[in-house]
């Protein structure tokens, strides 16, 4: 099996900004992905837990199973999986800050289940697991690795294995034109800004990039649930939280970082509302 090296540097430059900065706009779950506002009156924390539950419920988890979280962030889904679903968990991350906080949070649970975070990429992971979940990590992968990711995921799952991929994706110009959605120079500059200043090396997949490669690896796409407007609302909440903590944010990082993040959060919210970007949970079965 060819050895692929994870892109540690890109992930660490994106996420190893001070945790104190992210704490200013994230909720207590420390989940940095699209929330699911199942009810209009939900707080951001409630909606983040609802999103994690929405994903984990689709995996048909049973107590004692082992769940792999690819790109586990600060461990929010890992903690939820152990506490609510009574499973063993392994979280993979390329970010040292994510790894340290995830490790500490799992150690504080006091479970008899195996619960670990690893500073490791999926490219280096070869153990068998029962289920796989991944929240918005796929859109940081390189297109040339999409098929390999799905093939390796397929290989480490049992015959009744299930994977839940929660990912952003974008559309090609032709589809946008057919839908009457204009792609402007401002949009192109914004995407360039995201790649250079917020998510170095990031490249949004298309829906066919996800579906076609997953099917080529052997997966069946059982269900796709779109969450586009939920992300617009999530981004609004993050932007409001960060704006309210402007002085502290600048003190913790810098005015440039604060301005970049406000531009990113508000700009993404606008583009989700216009339909340029989408996000979905793809339920895959072996």
From Swiss-Prot:
Single GO term (MF): methyltransferase activity
Q: Name one GO biological process term.
A: methylation
Q: Which pathway is this protein assigned to?
A: Lipid metabolism; mycolic acid biosynthesis
Quote the Gene3D superfamilies the UniProt record gives.
Vaccinia Virus protein VP39 (3.40.50.150)
According to its UniProt record, the EC number is 2.1.1.-
Knockout consequences: Disruption of this gene suppresses trans cyclopropanated mycolate without accumulation of trans-unsaturated oxygenated mycolates and shows an increased ability to form cords, thus establishing MmaA1 as a negative regulator of cording in M.tuberculosis.
Q: Which residues form the active site?
A: 268
- Source species, domain of life: Bacteria
Q: List the CDD domains hit by this protein, alphabetically.
A: AdoMet_MTases
| Amino-acid positions noted as binding S-adenosyl-L-methionine in the UniProt annotation, renumbered to this chain | 32-33, 71-73, 93-98, 122-123
The record's keywords, sorted A to Z, are: Lipid biosynthesis, Lipid metabolism, Methyltransferase, S-adenosyl-L-methionine, Transferase
Q: Please, what other remarks does the record include?
A: Was identified as a high-confidence drug target.
- Identify its protein family: Belongs to the CFA/CMAS family.
User: What is known about what this protein does?
Assistant: Involved in the conversion of a cis-olefin into a trans-olefin with concomitant introduction of an allylic methyl branch at the proximal position of the precursor to both the methoxy and ketomycolic acids. It directly affects the cis- to trans ratio and indirectly affects the keto to methoxy ratio.
- Please name the PANTHER family in this protein's record: CYCLOPROPANE-FATTY-ACYL-PHOSPHOLIPID SYNTHASE
Q: Mind telling me what this protein is named?
A: Mycolic acid methyltransferase MmaA1
